[in-house]
A protein has these predicted regions:
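Class I S-adenosyl-L-methionine-dependent methyltransferase catalytic core
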Residues: 1-161
């Protein structure tokens, strides 16, 4: 999935990662504290950041993405598809797009084994802040399998080259 989104957004920073699971060349670790670190220190502006925040407390990450969008830094954030929570209401007041991933749930990767883990009990959505002025929040969908298949085709092309 990340490869497909990277093709669309050219993601330059993984804002909540470790050396073992970073998806971008530049990343911010828990110890570096992404909520306190200026993202502009890690990418050219305008640019996009990948953010898969800890699901236990998403609100401060929504606030950080909204703040960074004022600095011409866009964010693509993967979160549970739950529209009943306060952070969702806060996100749609500042985000440019909510993209629901439909047609199945995402399997997450076990950080130790590197293998997909099924049993995700919720669907997922992407909340996107663009690095330019916001006009409204658009609600869209993307098929999970289309996203995964597109990413797999890109990976296969890279490996064949």
């Amino acid at each position: 999935m990340f490869v497909a989104l990277d093709a669309e957004f050219c993601l330059k920073l993984d804002a909540a990662a470790s050396a073992d699971n970073a998806l971008c060349n530049h990343y911010i670790t828990e110890e570096q504290n992404t909520l306190e670190t200026p993202w502009a220190d890690y990418l050219s502006i305008p640019g996009y950041v990948w953010l898969n925040p800890p699901y236990s407390d998403i609100t401060p990450f929504v606030q950080k993405a909204a703040d960074e969008s004022k600095n011409q830094i866009g964010t693509v954030m993967l979160v549970p598809a739950d529209t009943s929570v306060g952070w969702f209401r806060e996100a749609i007041e500042t985000a440019s797009e909510v993209r629901f991933i439909v047609g199945g749930r995402l399997a997450f990767i076990n950080p130790i084994s590197g293998k997909p883990v099924s049993g995700n009990n919720k669907g997922s959505m992407l909340i996107i802040w663009h690095p330019y002025p916001r006009t409204h929040c658009q609600f869209t969908t993307v098929e999970r399998d289309a996203l995964l298949n597109f990413g797999a085709r890109l990976i296969a092309k890279r490996e064949a080259a």
